[in-house]
């Protein structure tokens, strides 16, 4: 009966139209998401987080779930502070150095957690891009590497960049957590490097930065040559692979031309051409450990959009404060067997 459904949903914390909540022992608690979550990604994450036998939460940072994917590879999962999709950071342990890919919001003692897992090894910290859920924890560390186009964006970080997570009364908007567990902002060294730059983690263990503009102007992926893994950043995502526009530039920052859909497509093609160098893909949100044969499907979707941007599968509109102005529109094209590409398109 409808009464029974209401009672069952109330008992589990599920609201109408929402997914079944994921059981969590994290210190953070979800208040709300900014937009509906993808059902397939949610099912994947629910199974992983509730049943994976490698999952561990360390006392030093109760905001992060740690999963072991390889002998030397750990996935660090954390809930997104602003209501967007929850995110991953990845920790590679090399023979002499470790590498942390992305820093999230820096919620909790991220540096202490990394030191705990690695046993205090020297750490190389790198960013895929500058967005808040990937780089706001950078100030937990002394030095961060990134693609050279990302440097001006990271230089814009400041002490008030977390303020938008709270309302005018200081209450958390999307995620319940202790505000004192956010980092105290400090300047850190930003080391911009070119496409193809190689990090040596000891011996013959090398990780290569690959410029993959599209989702962001200075976006980079990383290829672990030893474990044959592509860490793809946000250019690949089982929810929405968001990139730029077909015929306009949505960003106004430096190197903004690298957010265009054509640039995204060309960088996907570059990764397709290098599929013999990696076997698995680890995106920074939702599903990971994905086989590389997904890549041609992404390229096929990109080519279909560029050939006919009007042939989209669905479209969303977002209205601003001015109800008489045109809404912001995003168009979506399905990636065969995976998710969707979101793109901008100015008609006429």
Report residues per predicted region.
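N-terminal, intrinsically disordered, basic low-complexity segments enriched in Arg/Pro/Ser/Thr
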Residues: 2, 13-18
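Accessory terminal helices/loops
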Residues: 17-56, 266-348
């Amino acid at each position: 009966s409808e009464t029974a459904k209401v009672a069952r949903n109330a008992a589990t914390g599920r609201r109408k139209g929402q997914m079944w909540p994921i059981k969590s022992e994290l210190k953070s608690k979800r208040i709300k998401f900014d937009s509906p979550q993808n059902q397939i990604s949610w099912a994947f994450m629910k199974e992983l987080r509730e049943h994976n036998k490698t999952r561990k939460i360390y006392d030093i940072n109760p905001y992060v779930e740690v999963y072991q994917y390889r002998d030397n590879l750990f996935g660090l999962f954390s809930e997104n502070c602003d209501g967007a999709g929850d995110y991953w950071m990845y920790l590679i342990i090399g023979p002499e150095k470790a590498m942390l890919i992305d820093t999230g919001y820096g919620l909790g003692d991220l540096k202490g957690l990394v030191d705990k897992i690695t046993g205090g090894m020297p750490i190389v910290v790198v960013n895929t891009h500058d967005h808040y859920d990937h780089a706001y924890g950078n100030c937990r560390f002394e030095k961060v590497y990134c693609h050279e186009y990302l440097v001006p964006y990271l230089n814009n970080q400041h002490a008030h960049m977390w303020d938008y997570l709270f309302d005018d009364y200081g209450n958390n908007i999307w995620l319940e957590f202790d505000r004192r567990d956010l980092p105290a902002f400090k300047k850190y060294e930003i080391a911009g490097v070119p496409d193809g730059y190689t990090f040596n983690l000891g011996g013959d263990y090398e990780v290569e930065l690959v410029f993959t503009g599209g989702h962001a102007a200075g976006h980079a992926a990383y290829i672990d040559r030893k474990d044959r893994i592509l860490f793809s950043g946000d250019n690949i995502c089982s929810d929405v692979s968001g990139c730029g526009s077909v015929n306009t530039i949505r960003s106004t920052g430096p190197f903004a031309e690298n957010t265009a859909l054509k640039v995204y497509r060309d960088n996907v093609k570059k990764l397709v051409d290098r599929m013999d160098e990696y076997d698995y893909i680890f995106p920074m949100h939702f599903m990971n450990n994905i086989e590389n044969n997904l890549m041609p499907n992404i390229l096929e979707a990109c080519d279909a959009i560029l050939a006919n941007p009007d042939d989209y599968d669905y479209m969303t509109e977002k209205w601003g404060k001015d109800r008489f102005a045109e809404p912001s529109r995003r168009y979506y094209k399905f990636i065969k067997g995976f998710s969707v590409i979101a793109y901008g398109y100015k008609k006429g």
